[in-house]
């Protein structure tokens, strides 16, 4: 093992002693010997499995369709993507991660993404990982961008470079969960800005915590493709059910 890897593991072990890791599912301190999640909680997350929508990755109820109802009704700017969990099974976990400063959950989420979606990520063959940005005021009040924490861990374990400053959110928008689909699209017009030339990036993976309608990912994908990116994939932690 290389010296820096040994040092990294020692630092992690010391940090765990001073600030014990909490299980991302039950939020209890993870027992010594367990990894990033309690052994009793390992079976609780509900993963999105086949059949999945070929565009947004929602779990489909039927075997004879390729796309969910939402994706058959509207065209997306992103090419396709995947979500890891069914939203309801990890709703409380994501809430604590997003609003309760449980930043340490990011490592578990990223490791789980790699374990469950490794083949899909390899097939994407992306040049970069890009976290969906939050507005500077929201980042200041929250203290971090939850998507960037996941993206950073995913970049570390996959070796795909993260470009966290490439996309900026320049418009302070109303929270998307309060809006209809049309309102979401209008809310995000001119919300994002590409800060540098991206012509050298051919394929990228956007990373976000929750996929609802895809409006945010669409808005970012439009700007990236306008600046020369050819293919925009995404990976989200959670997504709802499809039809």
Task: State where each predicted segment sits.
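Glycine-rich phosphate/pyrophosphate-handling loop used in enzymes and phosphotransfer proteins
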Residues: 1-208, 212-243
């Amino acid at each position: 093992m290389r010296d820096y890897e040994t040092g990294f593991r020692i630092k992690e072990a010391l940090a765990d002693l001073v600030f014990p890791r909490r299980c991302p599912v039950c939020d209890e301190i993870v027992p010594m010997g367990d990894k990033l999640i309690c052994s009793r909680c390992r079976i609780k997350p509900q993963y999105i499995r086949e059949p999945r929508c070929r565009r947004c990755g929602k779990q489909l109820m039927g075997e004879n369709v390729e796309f969910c109802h939402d994706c058959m009704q509207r065209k997306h700017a992103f090419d396709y993507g995947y979500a890891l969990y069914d939203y309801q099974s990890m709703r409380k976990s994501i809430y604590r991660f997003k609003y309760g400063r449980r930043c340490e959950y990011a490592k578990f989420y990223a490791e789980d993404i790699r374990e469950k979606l490794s083949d899909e990520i390899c097939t994407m063959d992306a040049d970069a990982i890009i976290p969906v940005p939050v507005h500077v005021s929201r980042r200041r009040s929250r203290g971090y961008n939850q998507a960037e924490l996941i993206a950073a861990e995913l970049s570390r374990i996959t070796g795909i470079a993260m470009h966290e400053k490439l996309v900026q959110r320049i418009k302070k928008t109303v929270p998307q969960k309060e809006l209809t689909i049309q309102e979401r699209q209008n809310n995000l017009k001119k919300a994002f800005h590409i800060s540098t030339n991206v012509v050298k990036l051919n394929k990228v993976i956007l990373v976000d915590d929750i996929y609802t309608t895809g409006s945010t990912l669409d808005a970012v994908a439009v700007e990236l493709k306008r600046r020369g990116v050819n293919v925009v994939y995404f990976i989200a932690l959670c997504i709802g059910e499809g039809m």
